[in-house]
Amino acid sequence: MNIISFKSCMIGLMSALLSGCLVGPNYHRPPAPAPAQYKELPDWTAATPADAAPKGDWWTDFHDPLLDELEPMVAVSNQTVRQNYENYQQALAEVKVARAQLFPAIGITASVTRSGGPGYTGNGVAATNGNSVINSATLEGTASWTPDLWGKVRRLIEENAAIAQSDEATLANATLSEQILLATTVIELRIADANIDLGQKTVEAYKDSLRVAQAQGTAGITATPPSAVITAQVALETAQSTLIGLGVARAQYAHAIAVLVGKNPEDLDIPHSEAQPTLPTVPAGVPSTLLQRRPDIAAAERTMKAQNAAVGIAVAAYYPTISLSGAAGFSQSPLQGLLRAANRVWSIGASGTETVFDFGERHAEVQAAKAAYEAAVASYRNTVLNAFADVENDLSGLRILAEQAQALDTAVHDAIRGTQIALAEYQAGTVDYTTVAVAQETELSDQQTQLSIEESRLVDAVSLIGDLGGSWSDSQLHNP
């Protein structure tokens, strides 16, 4: 029996055995709770739901040059994303490891031995000195294989492939999360810049008010008590102190942005800007599309599939394991003519093992695998429910904040007008400085609240994009 015939025999046997059965339950995605429409959008229905998903680089809708520059860097340089990428690569390698178990392990063994002792020489002639030297060599090809009769290896491949897809979705979710965090932090920095601008304008306005109070007292136009000047002075000093403190938050936002794009804070300089991001319109689509658009939902669903395959692996332990092995090659002593046909040697064998009694271990393993699957189902459904709640929160937040912003715009306009009137009346001597101070505090408070609402609306818009899955869909998952 030569090596070629041996390999042909093994390949034929392997092909026959690969058609074995597949034990364990086949995977079917369980239904997930999905409402017909969002509660916060009761009167809206998309004619083409897929067209409602954000497309491509969603951050460009905010029209902020800093976002346009930095967002693409997240997928390349962010270390959290990098960590998840390597986890995904590891999972892909595990799929290859599992798939390799379907095939025989083939090796080669070579040995050369020289031994001596009483007896004959290597040529079979009696040694004259009573000692002999024998030279021998062996060259063999070996193969061993455990055929996947019951589908244990195929279930392992299925499990690892699902884990790899789950890790791929987790990578997409990590990338999206870091991009959303970057957009949120950039918005916070832009609002910090706006608060600094407001603080500078407030300081200048309070300086003017102090000069007016001082001038009123000096000119004797009206009875200006020292307390009026002190009140104006304190307001100015407080505004100056607040302005200085605003730099702390801005610096922290800039440092956080640097880390998100994989840079040291000292390597990223973000200049002050008066421009603010534009609030985009984010179409929510219909709830059913959310199941395909959120990578965390896809990751949870793939985890379910992996746990289902694990049940099959546990069930396969009930069945016997058959192993095949063989070797073919040459063996000769002495060394001359090792590869001659007369020196051929071969062996082939099979073994089987089956656990007869294990005190319930295999049954417990199956029960544990089934429980893990049911836990994965619950986790999947919980992820879906939380996803819908996230979107509803974003939609309600945007709606309520829009109403609040509209009401506050009127209040800010009236507050500015009120400060102007109070100053004019103070200069005319009809009111004291307390009226001016109160008007200025109201104006500043309303303007700060206005910026806070603007920030909340922008952050909610970013959050809605993230909670809708960005521009991702489960069609982007690869088959490992």
Segment roles from a protein language model:
Residues 2-76, 123, 161, 247-292, ...:
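Terminal intrinsically disordered/low-complexity segments used for targeting and assembly
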Residues 23-26, 57, 63-73, 82-85, ...:
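Small/polar-residue-enriched beta-strand and adjacent coil segments characteristic
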Residues 81-84, 91, 160, 167, ...:
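Amphipathic alpha-helical coiled-coil segments
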Residues 93, 100, 111, 169, ...:
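Regular, well-ordered alpha-helical segments
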Residues 153, 169-286, 397, 401, ...:
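Periplasmic alpha-helical coiled-coil/stalk elements that build and connect Gram-negative outer-membrane
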Residues 225, 387, 391-394, 429-433:
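Alpha-helical heptad-repeat coiled-coil segments that mediate oligomerization/polymerization in large
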Residues 272, 413-438, 462-479:
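A glycine-biased, small/acidic residue-tolerant capping/turn segment at secondary-structure junctions
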Residues 430-452:
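Short terminal targeting/anchoring segments
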